[in-house]
Each structure stands twice: as C-alpha cells, then as structure tokens.
Amino acid sequence: MGYHSTSETASNTADFLVRLKDFLVGTVGWTLRDDRSGDAEPSYVLASPGESGAEDIFLRFVNDSAVDRIAVRAYLYWDAATHTGVKEAFHTSYTYIKTVDASAFLYWIYADMDHVFIVTKIAAVYYAHYCGLLKRF
C-alpha cells in the first residue's frame, strides 16, 4: 500500500491525539491494540503487521499534557489485557510530537503500515516526528 496523508487543524493536544488515532486506524489500517483514553494521561497503543504483513509494530501515543506534547513509545509486543509492553524503545525526552494545549495548531500526517511521519506547526515553528520501522542493514 502507498502512503496516506492528511493535514488539518487540531484544537489542542487531546484533540490531536484522537485525530491521530482515528487517521492511523480508520484510513491507514493500523489496529487499535489498547485504548487508555480514560487514564489521567490518555494513551492509545496501535499495532501494525507492516507493509510486508510479517512485522510486529507496536506504538504507544501518550498525552503528556503537562509539557504540551504526545510522548511516543515503541514496543516489541503489547499485552492489552495487562496494559503493559515488552522491550520498550524510544523512551527518552526526545521521542515526542510537539503540541500545544492553549491554542489550535496545524498538523500534517504521512503514514503507511511501516512508518508514521508527523509535522506540527506551533506558532511560526515546524516540528517533525518519525516513528515506525527503522531501515535494516
């Protein structure tokens, strides 16, 4: 499958998180593995078998509204029954999507079953984020 894309305006971080989940699940074909939208820090875990159908991609998007961003984590596997991931990756202060809670912001999403690339525009500054498969050598 080819890339899908969208560009819209989100009213805040919470709105963007839902729009991101809806786009990846409804348009691109990712699976909602775990819905933690009722938590103090709402999150969604999305899963994909990749473009090849042989991958295991688990991405968790967490509304880290205390600092105007969505934290992104990757896992080797996600257990939806216990709400826990195995072999967490991307757990640093640099793996996030920059957002803002105080005002609306523009965003662009480009994605397929392997990759997710997001650009947000906060005031006059553009922020980019990539997550998904890394190129194998």
Please annotate each region the language model reported.
Residues H4-F137:
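Long, leucine/valine-rich, helix-dominated scaffolding and oligomerization segments
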